[in-house]
């Protein structure tokens, strides 16, 4: 077996349909108020999302067993070529750490240094110790720093471009991506260890190897067949646009609106025809002031009377006012589509917004915070236009330069030093419509969006009058006596409980270390 074959297994574990269904469609699209659910969970969407986090943990372990198997396999079978496979080893490591950051957001402490022993030549380590985030982050930062250096300097390397789903073998872009992941790590550290975070950011932003256009974005591109594996289509079975997100998109005439969602069928002719049907009840009557772009309430207590939520059909025409997400953004094969799939890890716009925030924190970066912000907004508009074309979404219409200029000139979008951070956070939230682990992480770090934020204003979520909160981590229970790796599992939980804001083991509202 060529060792690069294992790289595909790592890439495939970065996201799959199961993780997307459980974590995004059923949870974070709703928690972050991009969408409202029309199927699944209902009253317990903010408390008992039982499947949430299970697949991301499984995918982390899959990525780990293959990423750490690569160097062992080479040492055991191709020792004379070990140096020539340095790039392959480091690329797999970068992917694993990226997945580790995501997984640790949900679970806190993870097995890493001692993990996957049976796959990497250490079969004696059957019960690995767990490491806290405070221990993991310096390890990951150092490994990323070393990986960037090796990727920049390695020579006489064996090509794996046919298995490189991000950059097709372009190692200069992998160096930039590695530094981008370091900046992501630094942002996680900003609350707990601000000086260390800023030192990492300073090092990255002065390195000369950072993203400078949308084509540098750290994105995995899969083929059409990959999008047929699992329930990628479920986004349109489960979710519709939220009133919060649609209000924002309409208020600022954001051209990404037509890329994120499909226009509804509420033409004047269709509305008149539906309202005239003998079978249309008074409750089903469609108000004539509804537009082609509408969102629905996320709050359970408001859904029963939400006219935008009611399911209606005119023959086979879907007349529900709430807009459907563009399904091919998730499943290129939807409706006989021919496009592939994509997994955003760190986009150029994402990088710009992180750099803008660190610049506001006093980190010299070669640009002002305003320049980073404006570059990020433009990059987001251009990237989403490009990716929507790649996905062959329904009724695709590219975003024009004129639309970008008009959007950027609006009050609330044009740079305003008095609300600079909120502007950065708002645009970060929009950018992460698909990569919503990151908008969730931002919410956990800075509390944005919220019911009091101005550019994007969440609605308060109530279930039978009780105010709901966004979950912040996985619920835990102590392992049963005699269960695998019992002592280390117990120590893991006891160590996390030492943090004052960790909360009860079984509370999804407790905090992981970096949030505090």
PLM region descriptions:
Residues 1-33, 37-40, 75-79, 449, ...:
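Membrane-proximal, proline-rich intrinsically disordered regions
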Residues 34-113, 117-159, 338-343:
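Conserved, well-structured interaction surfaces
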Residues 138-222:
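Internal, well-ordered domain-core segments that constitute the primary functional module
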Residues 201-352, 359-457:
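Extended ligand-binding clefts on enzyme/binding-domain cores
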């Amino acid at each position: 077996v060529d060792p690069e074959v294992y790289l595909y297994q790592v890439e495939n574990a970065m996201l799959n349909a199961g993780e997307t269904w459980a974590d995004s469609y059923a949870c974070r699209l709703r928690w972050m108020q991009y969408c409202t659910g029309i199927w699944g969970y209902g009253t317990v969407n903010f408390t008992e999302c039982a499947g949430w986090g299970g697949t991301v943990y499984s995918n982390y372990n899959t990525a780990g067993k293959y990423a750490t198997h690569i160097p062992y396999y080479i040492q055991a079978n191709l020792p004379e070529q070990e140096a020539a496979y340095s790039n392959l080893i480091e690329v797999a490591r970068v992917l694993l750490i990226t997945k580790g950051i995501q997984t640790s957001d949900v679970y806190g402490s993870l097995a890493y240094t001692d993990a996957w022993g049976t796959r990497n030549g250490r079969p004696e380590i059957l019960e690995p110790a767990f490491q806290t985030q405070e221990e993991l982050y310096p390890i990951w930062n150092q490994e990323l720093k070393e990986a960037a250096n090796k990727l920049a300097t390695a020579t006489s390397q064996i090509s794996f471009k046919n298995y490189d789903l991000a950059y097709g073998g372009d190692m200069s872009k992998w160096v930039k991506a590695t530094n981008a992941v370091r900046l992501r790590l630094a942002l996680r550290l900003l609350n707990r260890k601000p000086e260390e975070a800023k030192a990492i950011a300073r090092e990255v932003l002065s390195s000369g190897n950072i993203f400078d256009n949308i084509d540098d974005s750290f994105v995995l591109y899969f083929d059409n067949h990959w999008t047929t594996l699992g329930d990628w289509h479920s986004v349109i079975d489960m979710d519709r646009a939220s009133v919060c997100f649609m209000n924002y998109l309409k208020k600022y005439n954001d051209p990404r609106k037509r890329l994120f969602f499909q226009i509804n069928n509420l033409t004047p002719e269709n509305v008149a025809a539906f309202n005239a049907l003998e079978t249309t009840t008074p409750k089903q009557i469609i108000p004539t002031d509804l537009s082609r772009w509408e969102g629905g309430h996320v709050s359970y207590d408001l859904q029963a009377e939400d006219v935008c939520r009611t399911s209606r059909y005119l023959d086979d025409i879907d007349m529900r006012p709430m807009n459907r997400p563009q399904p091919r953004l998730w499943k290129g094969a939807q409706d006989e589509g021919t496009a592939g799939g994509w997994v955003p890890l760190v986009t150029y716009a994402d990088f710009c917004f992180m750099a803008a925030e660190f610049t506001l924190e006093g980190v010299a970066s070669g640009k002002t915070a305003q320049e980073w912000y404006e570059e990020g907004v433009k990059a987001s508009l251009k990237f989403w236009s490009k990716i929507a074309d790649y996905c062959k979404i329904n009724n695709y219409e590219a975003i024009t330069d004129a639309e970008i200029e008009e959007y950027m000139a609006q009050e609330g979008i044009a740079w305003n030093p008095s609300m600079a951070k909120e502007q950065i956070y708002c645009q970060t939230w929009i950018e992460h419509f698909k990569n919503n682990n990151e908008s969730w992480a931002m919410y956990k770090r800075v509390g944005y969006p919220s019911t009091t934020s101005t550019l994007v204003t969440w609605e308060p979520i109530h279930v039978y009058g009780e105010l709901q909160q966004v979950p912040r981590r996985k619920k835990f229970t102590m392992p049963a006596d005699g269960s695998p790796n019992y002592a280390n599992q117990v120590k893991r939980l006891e160590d996390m409980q030492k943090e004052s804001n960790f909360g009860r083991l079984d509370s999804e509202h407790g905090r992981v270390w970096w949030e505090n």
